[in-house]
């Protein structure tokens, strides 16, 4: 579960390293974001000479959460960190590589490009 002021790791090579959640998109009173949800975030740490700079306001999709997510078959999946992938307005990743596993829930949310770039889908 991601809410306002949550710090996330970045799971792509866009150049950002840490994101700070500013807003959860999808309704005026929406409080939490889960896997596959889009957030508005500020870049808190970034590599030099990268596509995104420190202080940039970007959109990101949540790909891993430390809070367990229930699946229809009764199983749960959770990760060690909260992570996101920086996306553009067309919902495509800014980076060209994805690091670490991503959850299968992204497929239902139509993030096929992220699924195809990820080394593992759990």
Swiss-Prot record:
Keyword line: Ribonucleoprotein, Ribosomal protein, RNA-binding, rRNA-binding
Keyword DNA damage set for record: no
GO CC, one annotated term: cytosolic large ribosomal subunit
CDD domains: Ribosomal_uL14
GO molecular function: large ribosomal subunit rRNA binding; structural constituent of ribosome
A biological-process GO annotation: translation
Domain of life: Bacteria
Pfam families: Ribosomal_L14 (PF00238)
Keyword rRNA-binding among record annotations: yes
PANTHER family per the UniProt record, alphabetical: 50S/60S RIBOSOMAL PROTEIN L14/L23, LARGE RIBOSOMAL SUBUNIT PROTEIN UL14M
Protein family: Belongs to the universal ribosomal protein uL14 family.
Subunit-level organization: Part of the 50S ribosomal subunit. Forms a cluster with proteins L3 and L19. In the 70S ribosome, L14 and L19 interact and together make contacts with the 16S rRNA in bridges B5 and B8.
HAMAP family with a match to the protein in the record: Ribosomal_uL14
Stated role: Binds to 23S rRNA. Forms part of two intersubunit bridges in the 70S ribosome.
Name of this chain's protein: Large ribosomal subunit protein uL14
